[in-house]
Regions:
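Class I S-adenosyl-L-methionine
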Residues: 1-141
Length: 141
């Protein structure tokens, strides 16, 4: 939505539509109490909704709220894995690290109850824009 609130009606319909699938998605919505409630509902219903973040502290907040998190990192990041200040393990997306690995093969972003943050290297046509957003959020080094 344009007001930053996740629609409960849409969330219920989405959960019903994918209930028999291995489905995952990403959300950039703020973690307000209302949005947290809906994101937790969706994850309990079997749709893995990863909280997209641009800083380790934001990823830590999502994990502390009981939600799976992903983290966009600088394209020059050389570490394959590390830990955040809160002790959460971060792993760079396996499909970005190894030839022949696809999302369908890996399924790490779909894994329910995972305690690992999946990091994505900024890439593609929006790489420059992503790098600028990371710098603004304090996530780029």
């Amino acid at each position: 939505s344009t007001d930053g609130k996740i629609s409960r009606l849409y969330a219920r319909a989405l959960a019903a539509a994918v209930r028999h699938l291995k489905a995952w998605t990403y959300s950039h919505h703020r973690l307000t109490p209302s949005n947290l409630q809906i994101l937790r509902f969706l994850n309990r219903q079997g749709l893995t909704v990863n909280c997209s973040t641009e800083s380790e502290s934001a990823a830590d907040s999502a994990v502390a709220a009981g939600l799976p998190a992903v983290l966009t990192v600088d394209s020059a990041e050389t570490r394959a894995q590390w830990s955040t200040a809160a002790g959460n393990r971060v792993i760079v997306c396996p499909a970005q690290q190894r030839d022949g690995v696809t999302c369908s093969d890996c399924m790490l972003c779909h894994k329910r109850g995972r305690r690992v943050v999946v990091a994505f290297l900024a890439h593609g046509t929006g790489k420059r824009k992503a790098q600028a957003a990371l710098a603004a959020a304090g996530g780029a080094q």
